[in-house]
Design a protein with these regions (language model features):
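Short, surface-exposed basic-aromatic patches at helix termini and helix-loop junctions that form
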Residues: 55-59, 80-84, 100-103, 227-231
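N-terminal pre-Walker A segment at the start of P-loop NTPase domains
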Residues: 1-27, 162-203
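Short beta-strand-centered segment that lines the nucleotide-binding/catalytic pocket of NTP-utilizing
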Residues: 39, 59-74, 226, 233-235
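Glycine-rich phosphate-binding P-loop
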Residues: 36-54, 195, 206-235
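Conserved beta-strand scaffold positions in the cores of enzyme catalytic domains, especially
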Residues: 64-66, 106-110, 209, 234
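N-terminal accessory targeting/assembly segments
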Residues: 1-60, 65
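Short, flexible loop segments at the rims of nucleotide/cofactor-binding pockets, characterized by
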Residues: 14-15, 64-69, 187-190, 215-216
Length: 235
């Protein structure tokens, strides 16, 4: 971990489309957090507000977990401050979220009031064209990711048939101490983005990191996933 900061993606662009695990922002084994759900369209300052809150928290000695947007890794989807049991979260599409019990577990902040409506109106036609182009580019990108994902899954399946799964499972059980039983926390450390593949593996506080490249590494990780499925583990 660097400077009290950890980074994740709560959702990722994958060969099966966009997959979100926003429920993993707060670990299931943690005490309840109070969540400020930020509303309003693009350009109203949701990410900017979260960045400023994160900077202030770090400056005051708090650990901060940053959750970046897979559509723009420089933009924030959420910020968590564990010691304060506090979350700031973008609750707009495509991951629309609202407090389950407003006033008890969270509240909504409407940043739409800060939208420069006249500026948007002046560029109305341009913005509609750009939105259509963006949608077309995403459709093409996900088609490519889907094709790559199919090839990857086929390769991993073939590797699993030739691997000694019993030996792998024995190695995992003997070599790693499992956390206590519970519900795992699922998030992403890498994702394809419009800026390329973003990788946050170095922004963690793991004592030891083991890299398992290639399709055989994927087989190994699949078995590890099965082993920790019902434990308090970050996956």
């Amino acid at each position: 971990m660097s400077n009290g900061k950890r980074r994740y993606f709560p959702g990722a662009n994958t060969g099966r489309g966009f997959i979100g695990h926003f429920e993993g922002i707060v670990p299931p084994w943690s005490e309840p957090h109070y969540t400020y759900v930020l509303k309003g369209g693009p350009g109203v300052g949701k990410s900017t507000l979260m960045k400023k809150c994160a900077a202030i928290a770090r400056a005051n000695g708090f650990t901060v977990e940053e959750f970046r947007c897979a559509s723009d890794p420089e933009s924030f989807d959420a910020v968590r401050i564990p010691q304060r049991r506090l979350v700031l979260l973008d609750g707009t599409a495509p991951h629309t979220i609202d407090p389950a019990m407003p006033g008890i577990d969270g509240e909504t902040l409407d940043l739409g009031r800060f939208l420069h409506k006249e500026v948007f109106k002046r560029r109305r036609e341009e913005l509609f064209v750009l939105a259509e182009e963006n949608s077309a580019h995403y459709k093409n990108a996900f088609a490519c990711l889907s094709a790559a994902g199919s090839l990857r899954r086929a390769a991993v399946s073939e590797a699993a048939r030739s691997a000694d799964l019993t030996m792998i499972r024995t190695f995992l059980k003997e070599g790693f101490t499992l956390p206590r039983e519970g519900t795992p926390r699922t998030l992403f450390l890498t994702s394809p983005t419009p800026a390329g593949v973003a990788d946050f593996r170095e922004a963690q506080d793991a004592e030891n990191t083991v890299y398992l490249p290639g399709v055989l590494g994927a087989v190994f990780l699949n078995e590890a996933m099965k082993l920790v499925q019902n434990t308090q583990t970050e996956i």
